[in-house]
Amino acid sequence: MIRSRASRTSAVIVCIVLALAVAAAAATLNGVLPGPLPLFPRTNWWNADVSQAPLDSSSANFISFIGTTRRLHPDFGGEASPGSDEVYGFPYVVVDGSQPKKAVEFDYSDESDGVNHTTDQSVPFYPIPDEAIAHAHWIEGGQPGNVDLRSTSDRHLLIVDRDNRHLYELYNVFFDGTRWHAGSGAFFDLNINGRRPDTWTSADAAGLAILPGLVRYDEVFGPNEIEHAFRVTVRSTNGYVYPASHRAGSTTGALPMGARLRLKASKSLTGFRPEIQKIFRAMQRYGLIVADNGSDMYISGTFDTRWDNSILNPAFGALTANDFDVIQRGWQPIAGLPGPPTNLRIVSGQ
């Protein structure tokens, strides 16, 4: 059969349209995040200006507990060695709204989203791309999802639905060949300030979202100031305060989950490279939020092969815990904001 030029042209157009549709639906590792930025509304705790917040009455004691000479460390970077599966920092995945949802079996199902809490059954909820099963670098630590490292690594998987501005975060993931497993999982609508219910975890020990508190390459080297706080870990914690919702320790003298540290305004940033000054300015204005137990004064950021740790490590190491103050525990910029805890775990059929 001889096809007309018009029919051949139509066929080409159809193929192009289909190809573009597939491309649009493709999951992207460390893809472009949906605006407006920063993530979450301006009134969110991650985006609150704490430069004028009052000091905590025990600020000096908390800093002493950490160790006044304890140096900061950037807990992020690129590959452990060129071409290796192992990575430093948090990868994140950007998908579109049509990404198929997967059910996840949880160790802490009673505090996780994507679960019918009447029957305790997981439901299709998390838009996990298939690439995370066998591809390196899609999950924290770097190894693919079908490698079981749950006993030795946190294995976070962070997913952003760019069309709906939804954030899905999973802790301690593993794909067993049939289905996904995780320690816990949380959903955050980036359009609103939905806090986890008190005593509930998320994919992070404090019950907070992870991605909004990461040092990101695109922000550090972009034209604008960084307008959010950063996630920080300390070796021990004692309870929790707003904005956290979950405890993971009761060590006397330690900071609570959700505590905020602020780089002193008197700390001179002269001599640091421009991109480092930008990071440190954000620490002065937005501070750090204690979100997990780990190494003292480790600042969380994204995995990105463009990071240069020969620059980052000594720059961060020039700051010590004594360069920071602890602001008043539970402080909020405006009383009552952003509202009472919101249960985001309700699913259809519950």
What positions do the PLM features span?
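Low-complexity, intrinsically disordered regions enriched in charged/polar residues
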Residues: A23, F40, P338-P340
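Intrinsic disorder/low-complexity segments in short proteins, especially the signal peptide
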Residues: A23-A25, G349
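Pro/Thr/Ser/Gly-rich low-complexity, intrinsically disordered linker/stalk tracts
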Residues: G336-Q350
